Amino acid sequence: MREIPVSQVTDTVERLCIEANTHLPGDVKRAIEACRACEDGDIAVGVLNNIMENYQIADRECVPICQDTGMACVFLEIGQDVHLTGGDLREAVDEGVRRGYTNGFLRKSVVRDPVRRGNTGDNTPAVLYTEIVPGEQVKITLAPKGFGSENMSAIRMFKPSAGLQGIKDFILETVEAAGPNPCPPIAVSYTHLRAH
């Protein structure tokens, strides 16, 4: 059994909060560049050029890619042969978020109560997902989820008769209804549960 102090989790989450908000992953950069290469509309080309310039400046200056630095979504894959020591895992993650958003000078926009709108002042609590996996490693992935994407998202429960075409129609209706409101670039995707 491998022992890992939760302080390492805190330190890693702090670092990832800053990195995720200032450095766009390579696969995302390549996708944006590929879109730019095949785009021929002047406005779209201009928007994509601005996005590319923005992430280049963010990389170089270590400043946030976007003013909406989001809610920290933390994904933990914890090896079944790991014993986390020295404190509470949930608090260790939240302390990492607290430090990352403070030390990285990132905007704190999480509210305690969505009706009363009182800001927590430190961007906690994080959204935390855990999965137990084989081995003696801990893998931490952090994704800052901007709130603009939440405001433009939609969900619908389909009857089985809707079929794939019903789902496609809903996606197109949702994108059209959102219009110019979400920040570009807009990525359309779906999520599903893995069957075990």
Model-derived features with residue positions:
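Conserved small/polar residues in nucleotide/adenosyl-binding loops
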Residues: 191-196
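Non-transmembrane, aqueous-exposed alpha-helical and coiled segments at domain scale
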Residues: 1-188
